[in-house]
Amino acid sequence: MHSRCLFLAALICSLSLRAEIKAPQPEFKEYLVAPVRVHLLVTKGELNLTTTLEEKDITRIFEKVNRIWGHAGIHLPVEQLIKEPAENPNAYRQNYQSRNLRWLLALRPKTSRADSWFHVYYLKRFGVNGVYIGRNGMFVKDTARLRGVKDGMDEPIPRVTAHELGHAFTLKHRQSVTNLMASGTSGWTLNEAEIKQARTAAGKIKWISPAGEILKEADALHKQGKKKEAAALYRRIAGIPLHCPETARAKKRADR
């Protein structure tokens, strides 16, 4: 009986550390849209360089990422999902114990690199949960583990992904345990100063556009009968976590 009570107490405590991310408040017109190219590294004979994440996992992960970043009025649609082998597996074998993680850049396949978009690479294992090396080099391991905090996220990978994207928006670590930029916790919140800083940084990146501009361009293409081109733009904004006429129209036309 005593052990059962302890188990139930531990379970209740565990559940109390997890909470659904609150719904974002910004209106549609406030959103800035920053496309992401996701790379799933799957390398034959290299278990550490082979993620077991699938497309359905990425969909779930980025739904949570966007619920976090929605509080800053920033949306991060997965523009492209690529499954590919690491470019240089030897870089892992030679450097996996190194504290300098820039060697991870050597894993990026040359054919899928691009200056536009954010690039997030998923693999199985390396020394930390995730690392931001540049807009075109963010790395997250699918075995990430975090320290639970009150009202924190229920899953590590979306939180680690959102954290590294925070660095892409120039945010630094802030060791308030419930904060997104704290190290190693399940916290996901942003304060007003961080939101302002992230939006200012996003506004300076030429390939990040306001949602309203994307919708206007998509509507124009749709009116011209260019349904395929319009659908690509509608998909970019359809996942914004709002129930409004703009997202409803985008969702309806995104599959055409």
Q: What is each of the regions a protein language model found here?
A:
Residues 1-6:
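Bacterial N-terminal signal peptides that target proteins for export
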Residues 10-18:
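Hydrophobic h-region of N-terminal signal peptides that target proteins for export
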Residues 20-114, 124-126, 234, 241:
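Propeptide-to-catalytic entry region of secreted or membrane-anchored zinc metalloproteases
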Residues 24, 148-213:
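The catalytic-center signature of Zn2+-dependent metalloproteases
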Residues 28, 106-174:
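Active-site-proximal segment of zinc-dependent metalloprotease catalytic domains
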Residues 38, 78, 119-122, 139-140, ...:
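Structural recognition of the beta-strand scaffold that forms the well-ordered cores
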Residues 48-57, 132-137, 190-201:
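Short, polar loop/linker segments at the starts of domains and inter-domain junctions
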